Structures are given as C-alpha cells and as structure tokens.
C-alpha cells in the first residue's frame, strides 16, 4: 500500500516537471522569434545611473544570470571637449564563443550603430580600459536563447579631450548632421550638407538621412547621381543603406566603388549614411526614394509591372518612380498641354506685350528703310541745278519769251492779243507812212530807215501758244506798255489821225545763275 502511494507521488512530480519544461521551451521559442526586432529600453536592461561626471550600468538581473534573448543598447554622451572612459568590474561572465558570435558585448566609437567598431567582448575575463575618440560611445549587449551567464557591470567617466586642451575654450560638439524625409517620393542629396552648413570646409562628412514611407508602404531607392572621389577605398568614402534602423545588422548595401545599384527595402524606414574623410569632400550622391505597396493595386495607385504599386500622383510627373519607366511612357501629350497651360497663365501677358512692341518696332524700321532712299534721291534732284549746269557747257542764247508754267496761259493770251493789234496797226499805217516825211525832214528819213530795217528783221512768231515748251529754271518777266506817241520839237501839232510815230518798247530778261541778260527792241514808224 505504501509502495503504491509512493509511485503515485512520483508520477505527479514527473508530470509537473514535464509541464514546466514544456512551458519553458515554448517561451524560449517565442522569444527566439523576436531576436533583432525589439530593442529593450534601458529600464528593462538593468540599472543605469547617470551623473554629471559619468555613471554606471549593468546587464539585466546583475549579479544574477541575465535572461535569454535580450538586447540592450546604451548610448553614452559626454560634454563638449570631453571623451569617455569605460571600465568593467571583476565579476564578469558572458557566454564564451568563437569571435563572440553568440552572447556578446559590442562597443562602438560614436553615437550610431554604424560608428567605428572598437571591439566585441565575451568570456570570463573583463575587458580592459576602453576610451573613445569623441564625446559619444555606442554599446550593445545581446544574448541568445541558451547558456546564460553572470553578466557585467560597467562604469564610465568623462575626461578632457587632449586634442583641445591647447585651444583654450574652443568647443568640440559633434556635428548635428542628420536629416529626415517622408512622403510618396523625394530626393536625398549630399549637397544639402553644404547648403545647410552642417560641416565646415576641410572637415570630414558623416551624415545620415532617415526616410519614412507612407503608411503600410515600403521604400524603393534609385541613384540619380553617384561619385566617390576615391573609388574602392571604403575607409575614406562610402554610401551605406540600412533597412529598418541604423543598427549594423540592418545594413542593406554599402557602395564605395564606381557603380551604385538600386535598392528595394523591406520596411518603411530607410537610413542613408554618407562618410567622406577630409581628403574626400568631392564625393557626392543624389538618390530618389519612392513609397510603394505590393500588388494588388488599388484605384489610387498605379501598377509598375515590377511588383510595385505607386501613388497616382507620381504618374507623368517627369520623374521615373517605377523600376522601369512605365509611369512616364505615355505622357507626351499630357506634358505638352501642361507646359502650354503653364506658359499661358504665368507669362501670357509678358509675351503679348513683348510681341506687340517688337511688331511696332519692325513696322517703323520697314518704313524708315523704305523712305530713306527716296529722301536721298529728292535731295539730289533739288541740289542739282540743271540750268546752271547747262549754262556752263552751252553757249548763252536768248529767247523772246520765257514764262513760268503757272502763268503761261494768261500771259500767252495777252501776248497773242497785243501782237494781233500790232499787226493790224502796222498794216493800217503802211499806206500813209510817207505822207508826213516833209514835216520831219531828216528825222523822218531815219525813221523810215529804221522801219525798213525792222521790216527786214522780221521776228519769228509762232501762233501755237496752246502747248509751249515748259521752262523750269528761267525767271523771266514780260513788261507791257500802252501805246504812246512822241512828237519832235520841229514838227507842228497834228490831229490824232495824223500821228504816225508810235513806240512800243519790249524788254526781255533772261536770268542766269549769277547775272541777267537784257534785250530791248524799239519799233518806230
């Protein structure tokens, strides 16, 4: 009976042990799925005491064994012009392994997970004194699912930076060279460092860009420009891409050669880091990031034919957001219309006013060019004195009548009438011209001879005054006088019908360029 009771108790104890072990194994399996994903806050990673001169921290549950599958990160920051010294207590034990691949303590010289690695520590012997080169130190403790140990306890203190002791008060803060971008797409560019004066000329460049995609989206990265001043020298210049965080285990790609490929991230957070030492400041890059979701695509997204769905606002925007240019293939008509519309709205008035001014100036120029030669010809015609030129080469001659074109009709009519009267008077006086010769004596004889000479010197006369030859440059005057009768003092008074002496003076003036010629004809009978 007693033996049976003892067997029953043993069975219960065995079942209890199996149940506890099963629960422990299940818990370890669940914790193992969270490795590298969740960063445990410092409050859950043991004690951390901070002071103005330093502080101390320890692994979880120290001095008891640390739990499995734990990850704790400690970032130490000193004041400007100071560095950090880190020491460990003698009671120290972390699961030993080759190259500390399992449980380990990682220390980096800087504030980030990609800062230069100082070393990895594990085993039973505590590390020696660790000293930073700047005012930051990044420390990570990690444990796997089995073989836990005692852990560690570390102390840190701030010491003066020996590189600045001789400069007397010059501060040495770490360059705040961090940028954040988000949205459907955007540009990451290294020129932003100089534009915002994040670093001084001659200093090394160590900057990061944190990219956040739209909700439930991933990130696609494509280099638009990339050049390393010292190719294939990754210690001097490189561009690194991290997927999810800046932790070293999340490094996706690192470029330091002559070519940089596109990168497709699996999360919605991307970190871009650029490093260039003092002699590599000419290194540069420009990168396009695009938020995308995996198919099936919704009505608000565009299918890129490369397992990507991008926002409709990125289609035909002049930038290739897809891995292949599907989003910009059929946009020629749309681009032309958009460009014309933009020009019409913003510059239509300016273009119209400018075109009007140019048109007016063109018309004025044409008119000036057309009229200018005519003015020259008219000026030459006015300056050229044909009469004076002809007088130089032709012998002088006289004409009986020289009239202006405007007065020729009236003057010719009067002249024709007077000549007719003259001819009639001549015919009527011819029969009785010798009646009174005995009254005048020798004077009558001279008058007779004068009339005879006048008869023999018959002046040429043309009766076709209707169309005379125009005289352009001669300035002539024609003087008319009424018939007058002269008596000699030797002759007695006679009746009006006995008057036989009549004088008709006619003066013809022909003016040249400088002087005038005058001719007068007196006819007596």
Swiss-Prot record:
Its main location: membrane. Disulfide bonds join 45-72, 100-122, 177-207, 234-256, 297-309, 304-322, 316-331. N-glycosylated. It comes from the Eukaryota. InterPro entries: CUB_dom (IPR000859), LDL_receptor-like_sf (IPR036055), LDLR_class-A_CS (IPR023415), LDrepeatLR_classA_rpt (IPR002172), Sperma_CUB_dom_sf (IPR035914). Brain (at protein level). Interacts with GRIK2 and GRIK3, but neither with AMPA-nor with NMDA-sensitive glutamate receptors. This is Neuropilin and tolloid-like protein 2. The lineage of its organism: Eukaryota, Metazoa, Chordata, Craniata, Vertebrata. The gene is Neto2.
């Amino acid at each position: 009976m007693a033996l049976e009771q003892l067997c029953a108790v043993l069975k219960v104890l065995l079942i209890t042990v199996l149940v506890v072990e099963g629960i422990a194994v299940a818990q370890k399996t669940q914790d193992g799925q969270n490795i590298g994903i969740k960063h445990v806050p410092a409050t859950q990673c043991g004690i951390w005491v901070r002071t103005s001169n330093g502080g101390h921290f320890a692994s979880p549950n120290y001095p008891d064994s640390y739990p499995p599958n734990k990850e704790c990160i400690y970032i130490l920051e000193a004041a400007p012009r100071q560095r950090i010294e880190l020491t460990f207590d003698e009671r120290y034990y972390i699961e030993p392994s080759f190259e500390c691949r399992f449980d380990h303590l990682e220390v980096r010289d800087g504030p980030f997970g990609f800062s230069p690695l100082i070393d990895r520590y594990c085993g039973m012997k505590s590390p020696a004194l660790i000293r930073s080169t700047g005012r930051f130190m990044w420390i990570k403790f990690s444990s796997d699912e089995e073989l836990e140990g005692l852990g560690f306890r570390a102390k840190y203190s701030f010491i003066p930076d020996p590189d600045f002791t001789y400069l007397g008060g010059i501060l040495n803060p770490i360059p705040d060279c961090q940028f954040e971008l988000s949205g459907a797409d955007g540009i990451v560019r290294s020129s932003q460092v100089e534009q915002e004066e994040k670093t001084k000329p001659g200093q090394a460049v160590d900057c990061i860009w944190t990219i956040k995609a739209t909700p439930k989206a991933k990130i696609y990265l494509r280099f638009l420009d990339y050049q390393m001043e010292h190719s294939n020298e990754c210690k001097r210049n490189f561009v690194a891409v991290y997927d999810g965080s800046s932790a070293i285990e999340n490094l996706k790609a690192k470029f330091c050669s002559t070519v940089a490929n596109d990168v497709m991230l699996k999360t919605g957070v991307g970190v871009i880091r650029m490093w260039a030492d003092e002699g590599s400041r000419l290194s540069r890059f420009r990168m396009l990031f695009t938020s995308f979701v995996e198919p099936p695509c919704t009505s608000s997204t565009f299918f890129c034919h490369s397992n990507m769905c991008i926002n409709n606002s990125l289609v035909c925007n002049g930038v290739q957001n897809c891995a292949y240019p599907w989003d910009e293939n059929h946009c020629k008509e749309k681009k032309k219309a958009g460009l014309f519309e933009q020009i019409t709205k913003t510059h239509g008035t300016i273009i119209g006013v400018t075109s009007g001014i140019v048109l007016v100036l063109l018309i004025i120029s044409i008119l000036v060019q057309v009229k200018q030669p005519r003015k020259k010809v008219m000026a030459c015609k006015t300056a050229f004195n044909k009469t004076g030129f002809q007088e130089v080469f032709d012998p002088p001659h006289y004409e009986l009548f020289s009239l202006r074109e405007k007065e020729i009709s009236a003057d010719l009519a009067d002249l024709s009438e007077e000549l007719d009267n003259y001819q009639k008077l001549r015919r009527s006086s011819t029969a009785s011209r010798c009646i009174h010769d005995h009254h005048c004596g020798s004077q009558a004889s001279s008058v007779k001879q004068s009339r005879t000479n006048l008869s023999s010197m018959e002046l040429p006369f043309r009766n076709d005054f209707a169309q005379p030859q125009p005289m352009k440059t001669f300035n002539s005057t024609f003087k008319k006088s009424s018939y007058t009768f002269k008596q000699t003092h030797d002759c007695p008074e006679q009746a009006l019908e006995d008057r036989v002496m009549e004088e008709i003076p006619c003066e013809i003036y022909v003016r040249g360029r400088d002087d005038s010629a005058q001719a007068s004809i007196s006819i007596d009978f």
